[in-house]
Amino acid sequence: MRGIVGFYITYLLCLILGIACVVLVVHWNFMYRDGFAWDGSSKNFNWHPVLMVTGMLVLYGNAAVVYRIPLTWGHNKLPWKLLHAGLLLLSFIFSVIGLCAVFNFHNVHHTANLYSLHSWVGICTAALFTAQWVMGFTSFLLPCTPMAVRAFVKPTHVWMGAMILVLSIVSCISGINEKLFFVLKETTNGTKPYSALPPEAVAANSLGVIIVAFGLVVLKILSNQMWQRPEPGDDEGVYRPLAYDGS
């Protein structure tokens, strides 16, 4: 019972932090960066952080922990596979649109693409995520895939999932930091410099801290052996979350 209570407290924290990430990134870009548009202006760029944080981080993180929810244990796994794959697909769509937003902004302003460390890590993360989704779909959702193949692929699939989350966190916080260095320059646009810690810097830095906290909570859920979904034949195929203590 204690293991289950601990899970739901941690999972509630995961949900709260995820919502906070989305709210803060929208607040930052709406209140301090003038909102959103799709016209090649800076408002066009603002879609990039919002969609990447929402897609590659929050939706991705929640998709990763679906199988850990005890209420799903002992039931047909297919609906949860579909939910897992669906959240990841939505995450992929958000991420693609987010990448299109930044490429469109750069192209309109004749700015080079993929030159910074942030962009290198980010595009590698997106590529790995795409490969991970394709591997997961072909290995675990196609009924024709042999069980031996699924068993062979699963450890790599799980490991890659955690690594992609870590890379997403790195991409998000490096992107936030890069953006603040670009826009908070007293000598070029009259704003207070980043070093003076104006309100925008406080809001964006707070977003970065919450992103890290969200990622750590998701990794905690994924790494706790007590919260792993019991496999068939492990004497835990019966749905019993209220009595389950992780032993």
UniProtKB/Swiss-Prot annotation:
Gene3D superfamilies: 1.20.120.1770. Residues 25-46, 104-120, 177-201 are lumenal. GO terms for biological process: intracellular iron ion homeostasis. Residues 1-3, 68-82, 142-155, 223-247 are cytoplasmic. One of its GO terms (cellular component) is late endosome membrane. Its main location: membrane. One of its GO terms (molecular function) is oxidoreductase activity. Glycans are attached at N189. Binds 2 heme b groups non-covalently. It is found in: Late endosome membrane; Lysosome membrane. PROSITE patterns: CYTOCHROME_B561. It is a multi-pass membrane protein. Its EC number is 7.2.1.3. Heme b 1 binds at H48, N113, L114, Y115, S116, H118, E178. It is an enzyme of class 7 (translocase). SMART domains: B561 (SM00665). The chain crosses the membrane at residues 4-24, 47-67, 83-103, 121-141, 156-176, 202-222. It catalyses: Fe(3+)(out) + L-ascorbate(in) = monodehydro-L-ascorbate radical(in) + Fe(2+)(out) + H(+). L-ascorbate binds at K77, K81, R150. Transmembrane reductase that uses ascorbate as an electron donor in the cytoplasm and transfers electrons across membranes to reduce iron cations Fe(3+) into Fe(2+) in the lumen of the late endosome and lysosome. Reduced iron can then be extruded from the late endosome and lysosome to the cytoplasm by divalent metal-specific transporters. It is therefore most probably involved in endosomal and lysosomal cellular iron homeostasis. Homodimer. This is Lysosomal membrane ascorbate-dependent ferrireductase CYB561A3. It comes from Danio rerio (Zebrafish).
